[in-house]
Amino acid sequence: MTPSPPPITYISIPLPTNDVVSRSIHNLTTAISSHRPWSELIFSGDFSLPESFSSLLLRSKTNFNYFFVNYTIIVSTCAAFALITASPVALIVVGAIIALWLIFHFFREDPLILWSFQVGDRTVLLFLVLASVWAIWFTNSAVNLAVGVSVGLLLCIIHAVFRNSDELFLEEDDAINGGLIGSNLR
């Protein structure tokens, strides 16, 4: 009887920081490019009151899954506008913090290497949280940011509730991931 081969393990190869940044920016642009056409968001489809609470929930869920990237852009734009009206410095500082979150947390695929040392995920997360708290405290923009995000969310919720979603067709994978249809895989 021959011994079984050792299990195969996959190890990611650490990349330099500038490669992590460029890959993160590429992932961000790929994510943003998946938005639905704005004309489809605004002009196509009819707007009406839902007939029941269950149809309201289904319509909202379908619209949120279908227009998720568009809604994210709307909320971000409202938050940015609120920060511009408060202080341009606040917009720059909070924008830099958001960029740090996108690059070093959400779109990073490989371990972060700084000065030949691998930085752990907890350390990166702690740094990002502390930087975010500092930025909001430094710019006194917590109220303005909350108002901007709230207005953006309100606009998206109103659109999701009143836009009739009967003619929207999601890709099968999007519908399964969004929980709109079940999967046969168990």
Curated annotation (Swiss-Prot):
Expressed in roots and trichomes. GO terms for biological process: vesicle-mediated transport. The keyword Endoplasmic reticulum applies. The chain crosses the membrane at residues 66-86, 87-107, 119-139, 142-162. It is a multi-pass membrane protein. The lineage of its organism: Eukaryota, Viridiplantae, Streptophyta, Embryophyta, Tracheophyta. InterPro entries: Prenylated_rab_accept_PRA1. Belongs to the PRA1 family. GO terms for cellular component: endoplasmic reticulum; endoplasmic reticulum membrane. It comes from the Eukaryota. It is found in: Endoplasmic reticulum membrane. This is PRA1 family protein G2. It comes from Arabidopsis thaliana (Mouse-ear cress). Keywords: Endoplasmic reticulum, Membrane, Transmembrane, Transmembrane helix, Transport. May be involved in both secretory and endocytic intracellular trafficking in the endosomal/prevacuolar compartments. Its main location: endoplasmic reticulum.
